[in-house]
């Protein structure tokens, strides 16, 4: 049985927890929760019978095999650092943190030294296995075009000085590189960092707000020595968190299931 602890107890964590309590993932269980808002951890604890912790230190001190981060970019460094030093592998959902090259390299080196694993799920996009394979050749271009409902980008749109209600037709709200994208849209464009890590090539990113769209659309174009990879996924948003695609949560569930089973399909 794979014993899991979760950092961050919002809508996505709740969805993943329900899956881990079901027969869909029979060989893994959540045993402990932590959130900066203790009441959120307590609520999930009461619903599941797992422990609620008052700190990450308390969480990683438990008898766990795996820590799942689904909190925020700002929580990644502490979560990964303390998990690895406590002899635990860790899954990172807020992979936007790895746009910070120094942080990525420091945590990579630490995990290597301690013989622990840092897992990055494929998230809300398709084709990551093929792109990883292609990265062993030569990649010449990586482009991500993400289109989301206006309300799914509301906070980021406001931060840009725009009014969501005034967007009445599809509008490009960002065009630039992966580093700029995750800086301006830290809760909406983690997929750009997953794509860049998989391809080992800094993705070019375009973000479109569409008032007529009800799904989160991610279109990928990768060119390289193996040929051209094109994918398009139209994801339903998480019911309680429209900033996140439901597929992002399901990709974590699948990763945990894979880690708990003797045979793994895909790279």
Swiss-Prot record:
Disulfide bonds: none annotated. The active site is at 218. The keyword Amino-acid biosynthesis does not apply. Its EC number is 1.4.1.21. It is an enzyme of class 1 (oxidoreductase). Signal peptide: none annotated. It catalyses: L-aspartate + NADP(+) + H2O = oxaloacetate + NH4(+) + NADPH + H(+); L-aspartate + NAD(+) + H2O = oxaloacetate + NH4(+) + NADH + H(+). Pathway: Cofactor biosynthesis; NAD(+) biosynthesis; iminoaspartate from L-aspartate (dehydrogenase route): step 1/1. Gene3D superfamilies: Dihydrodipicolinate Reductase, domain 2, NAD(P)-binding Rossmann-like Domain. NAD(+) binds at residues 124, 190. One of its GO terms (biological process) is NAD biosynthetic process. Keywords: NAD, NADP, Oxidoreductase, Pyridine nucleotide biosynthesis. InterPro entries: Asp/hSer_DH_NAD-bd, Asp_DH, Asp_DH_arc, Asp_DH_prok, L-Asp_DH, NAD(P)-bd_dom_sf. One of its GO terms (molecular function) is aspartate dehydrogenase activity. The keyword ATP-binding does not apply. HAMAP family: NadX. Specifically catalyzes the NAD or NADP-dependent dehydrogenation of L-aspartate to iminoaspartate. The iminoaspartate product is unstable in aqueous solution and can decompose to oxaloacetate and ammonia. Belongs to the L-aspartate dehydrogenase family. This is L-aspartate dehydrogenase.
